[in-house]
Amino acid sequence: MSAPTTAIDALLAEHADLERQLADPALHADAGKARKAGRRFAQLAPIVATYRKLEAARGDLEAARELGADDASFAAEVPELEATVDQLETQLSDLLAPRDPHDADDIVLEVKSGEGGEESALFAADLARMYIRYAERHGWSVTILDETTSDLGGYKDATLSIRSKGDSADGVWSRLKFEGGVHRVQRVPVTESQGRVHTSAAGVLVYPEPEEVEQVQIDESDLRIDVYRSSGKGGQGVNTTDSAVRITHLPTGIVVTCQNERSQLQNKARAMQVLAARLQSLAEEQASADASADRASQIRTVDRSERIRTYNFPENRIADHRINFKAHNLDQVLDGDLDPLFDALAAADKQARLQSS
């Protein structure tokens, strides 16, 4: 089954136009526009390459059929060429299937402790480190925008910005978008003197980050901006000035804080980026019932019973309850080895999309 010619022609024309734009030095004077064009080009590249392979295979098949009428050696090639054409048509159909429009986006990720007190905060910090190590494996940059630590060095809450450094169509969101929800841990807490296994939980929220704050309509009159003395790690002198920023979006009640940059101006800019990401997600929730259902699957209350995944330390086991994924390599997972799990989640999501289409 082949894609409509007009749709393919439009994509080929767009790909060629983007190729010309990217070759023009003038485009790269605007880093934002250049990155947007680069990401779209990267998204179209496999479609164009697969289509060209398909056209070549179709030509070979047609020639083999014609020549095979008089030459058995050409006729023998027909079944293999037919299989190649079928395979390429399936690949092209998959590439042309609607995909998440945010897959190329960077993200804002929040980790929050829940039931379990100090142990929950320590586990929240373990989750944050897990995502940081995963990002490092992929060459992504991570910035801790805000953090509130517990007495033992855990995270009551933390906000991370995770950004890719390239123009891949499969960006940070495409890999980490399934992480939103309640994560449950079973282990012996450091505060447990009797050696008993306890269960606690931490929550994760993930938002695609708009490339520009201006993409999201934010009325300055809807904001209350407070500044206060930072307790973060923003550098020398950070505790002697009111450099931390708290922004409250009055219509929604969303509160964003940022204190780890060196200046009040930088903290405000970062906080506005996080606010834009959260408002964008909220708007998409309200515009789509499916998005609302997806967001409802993220953390609403950090309740141990509402979990998407369990981390069992005594058995070195991780279990994702949405897809019945189990593995006994928890130590490696916490060190950022998440791709097998993420591949399984992406495959399940793709299958669900195909079934619903």
From Swiss-Prot:
N5-methylglutamine found at: Q236
Cellular location(s): Cytoplasm
Main location: cytoplasm
Description of post-translational modifications: Methylated by PrmC. Methylation increases the termination efficiency of RF1.
SMART domains reported for this sequence: PCRF
SUPFAM superfamilies: Release factor
Transmembrane segments: none
MF GO annotations: translation release factor activity, codon specific
Superkingdom, taxonomy of origin: Bacteria
GO cellular component: cytoplasm
Keyword vocabulary terms for this entry: Cytoplasm, Methylation, Protein biosynthesis
Family: Belongs to the prokaryotic/mitochondrial release factor family.
Protein purpose: Peptide chain release factor 1 directs the termination of translation in response to the peptide chain termination codons UAG and UAA.
Protein's name in the database: Peptide chain release factor 1
Native source species: Mycobacterium sp. (strain KMS)
